[in-house]
Amino acid sequence: MTRKNTTTNPWAKFHGPNLGYVIEQYDLYVTGAGSVDPELQELFEIFGAPSFQDDVVTGDNTATHFSPQNTGNIEKILKVVQLVEQIRSFGHTLAHINPMEDAANGQSLLEKAMSELSDADLKAIPAKTVWQDAPEGIHTALDVIHRLKDVYTKSLAYEFSHIQDSEERAWLHQMVESNSLRQPLSNKKRTALLKRLTAVEGFEQFLHKTFVGQKRFSIEGVDMLVPVLDEIVLEGAKNGVEDVMIGMAHRGRLSVLAHVLEKPYSHMFAEFKHAKIEGAVANSGWTGDVKYHLGREQVVSNEEVSTRVTLANNPSHLEFVNPVVEGFARAAQENRKKSGLPDQDTSKSFVILVHGDAAFPGQGIVSETLNLSRLNAYQTGGTIHVIANNAVGFTTDSYDSRSTKYSSDLAKGFDIPIVHVNADDPEACLAAANLAIQYRMLFKKDFLIDLIGYRRYGHNEMDDPAVTQPQVYKKIKNHPTVRAIYADQLQAAGVLNADEVETITQFTQEQLKSDYAQVPPADTSDATIHVKVPDVVAKGIQPIDTGVEIDSLRAINEGLLSWPEGFNVYPKVKKILERRKDALEENGKIEWALAESLAFASILQEGTPIRLTGQDSQRGTFAHRHIVLHDTDTNETYSPLHRLPNINASFSVHNSPLSEAAVVGYEYGYNVFAPETLVMWEAQYGDFSNTAQALFDQYVSAGRAKWGQKSGLVLLLPHGYEGQGPEHSSARPERFLQLAAENNWTVANLTSAAQYFHILRRQASILGTEAVRPLVLMTPKSLLRHPLTLSTASQLSEGRFQPALEQENLGMKPNKVKRLVLSTGKMAIDLAAEIESGKHEYNLDEVHVVRIEQLYPFPAEKVQSIIKRFKNLEEIIWVQEEPRNMGAWHYMAPILFELAGDKVKTGYIGRPDRSSPSGGDPFAHKAEQELIVAHALDVKYNFRQDKQEIEVYSN
């Protein structure tokens, strides 16, 4: 039998006849020898077997043995126990948590039990019979019911029943049922809270009246979001937290910037006015972004403590900032200045994510990110989630935007405690915030606050919400603001009088007017419309020598091939590794995986930490990497990169969950916050990377131009056409090339292990500098072990990465060369294999082949210098394995036209336009590929006469 844990044990105080009766019924329940009352049967399922404990001590401190005379019959006691548990579990259904609605109608769940118990019945039952830890002043079951209904069915409502850990559940119930959570605030704090609400409301109303019609995505209706964030931040600081990371969308963002992150009002007004103001710190890139997307970093303090708060930049793609901010936090928590895995201290930082009530259940990135919360590679010691719940998504009502009762219900599946709170009850909101931060700091797990309010205006300030929600907006129009409600409460309590409240309001208004007066007129100069990329970005990555001495490489390789005594490496893996033993000797050959490990080790020895994640990254999708070894007897793991000498930087490689978007966002965020770290994400197959397309579009490619947010993230995207069908062929390089501009990233498709070695080392060398940018690599599959991609030790020890490579033994007679073939990646190796096979009749004196290793930025000078050698060149051909509407062709075509000039033709050889990236028939694939290779190398082939679908010619 499974026993469920709970904070109330109904058997704890049963004695005499009552205990005997319950035990008798339990025996019948266990043996099945007779019928048991359904209510008792349910309690046996919940609480297990009854057991003897000490006598009850009632409110008058008199020891009491239960009997039918002083406790009522057993059935009534059990009904009370059930009622207590129902209030705890379902009290939220009765709670008044929505300021736009009357108290929730949860009568069906609780009223039946209440109707079967009179006040006299409840008064006859001692409190500790049904609530073992009843606080002082609670003497009878009637007191218990009144107290618990006051706790669970007012403006705070709780959902804890789904929490699996009994210790956590007991702590949560104890916190909310004791007096500690709702201690009255001091008059000083209540006055400060009113001042904060006055500032929030005053700021929003000032914007509303001063910048009529401009979008601001007002916080009004959930104004308490600002004090809630204040409370969480400062309570975190009291616990020693150094960094608080906040992710949120545009709703309420301007008020959070102005108040939580202390962005001066004058700077906010200048952005609305399009004016330049002295002292404003640029927090955007050269193209910039709208004001409600921008982030900020600020040290926040009070008289006692301080902490750094970071509000992440984000687009309007709702919730996609979530994993980015989690990556920030993990980077802030880890010490990467030692070998082995980094040391993580989750008390150093935590995340607050502000969600929308429609977006939280609606966007899949939310559940992807929640799934990271307990994983070793991604957990950050607990995130505090706040749903800024205004009960509408643009024009869509909640009944059209989710299939659950609450917008927060998704969180139940991740074992997250949930508090619903009425946003018109300020002190209840602060209580929820306090519970959240205490739980997070104690249990290192997520917590969710559902802050339920309303939206005073439309989705934006030019929108009329009454068109689609006429009834609710009649209510909202006449509904007082939370500031007004709280001001009335403080006046009624004698904390402030009307004049003092008015003084607070006037002070806020004067401050706003004064700050607005500091803003100069709008800047209408031409300079504001001319976008200039910083010179260091425009120049691109300058040549960097990345070779490593052979002796150092040999020492590294020796270390990579050693493991602790008694560690039993899987025999097949051991053979793979042992083949690498002589790879750096005179006649040795270095394959892709070894080149990668050598690059990693040398980068670590130079003090650069490395983090690599992906769905199979420890072994490698194609069983090539084996960077983490598993003992065949114990399943213990060992990574040689953790034990190499002369390393003072961490190395972590993790298998990720089956998610692309959240993991890419997380790694991007980690890299932004730890710019000195080589952070790499590897797709299982490049084909699957497009499920993270929003992250590539909004963050990785454009983050620096929009927000000045630098990243050196590396994307490893397995790519290559091998007859494996449309889901295992293409990383869709065309999409990355379409996004390529302003030297925003490097896109490469390499053909040798040495090139991979050098480009990784080059990327590591630019981390933390102004020259840094992401690196998008189309990585190989079949080429991982292809003999034509192997490299020698000298190719690693000398030189640097080459953006373009010429095919060896071609172009030896420059005056005879008529065709220059350009290709990249696996296509270039297929051409090389055909050339070296000798099984052809082409006149190769008339052909030269160049491999474009770096697609973007295109190595124009290098290719131009090659073209100049061939005085009789007639055509430049781009050859690719992808369909014409995919791959690099549409990116390459204008480049080739410019390179060719007026006298040289340009052309394309490859598959025709197709809707699917690849066919599914391996035999058809092979035939097509052979035809592409043959036509590319055969100068006699006349494009303009042959209309076969396999190639298209462009003049």
Curated annotation (Swiss-Prot):
Its cofactor is thiamine diphosphate. Its EC number is 1.2.4.2. It is an enzyme of class 1 (oxidoreductase). It catalyses: N(6)-[(R)-lipoyl]-L-lysyl-[protein] + 2-oxoglutarate + H(+) = N(6)-[(R)-S(8)-succinyldihydrolipoyl]-L-lysyl-[protein] + CO2. Belongs to the alpha-ketoglutarate dehydrogenase family. It comes from the Bacteria. SMART domains: Transket_pyr. It comes from Bacillus cereus (strain ATCC 14579 / DSM 31 / CCUG 7414 / JCM 2152 / NBRC 15305 / NCIMB 9373 / NCTC 2599 / NRRL B-3711). GO terms for molecular function: oxoglutarate dehydrogenase (succinyl-transferring) activity; thiamine pyrophosphate binding. Keywords: Glycolysis, Oxidoreductase, Thiamine pyrophosphate. Homodimer. Part of the 2-oxoglutarate dehydrogenase (OGDH) complex composed of E1 (2-oxoglutarate dehydrogenase), E2 (dihydrolipoamide succinyltransferase) and E3 (dihydrolipoamide dehydrogenase); the complex contains multiple copies of the three enzymatic components (E1, E2 and E3). This is 2-oxoglutarate dehydrogenase E1 component. GO terms for cellular component: cytosol; oxoglutarate dehydrogenase complex. E1 component of the 2-oxoglutarate dehydrogenase (OGDH) complex which catalyzes the decarboxylation of 2-oxoglutarate, the first step in the conversion of 2-oxoglutarate to succinyl-CoA and CO(2). One of its GO terms (biological process) is glycolytic process.
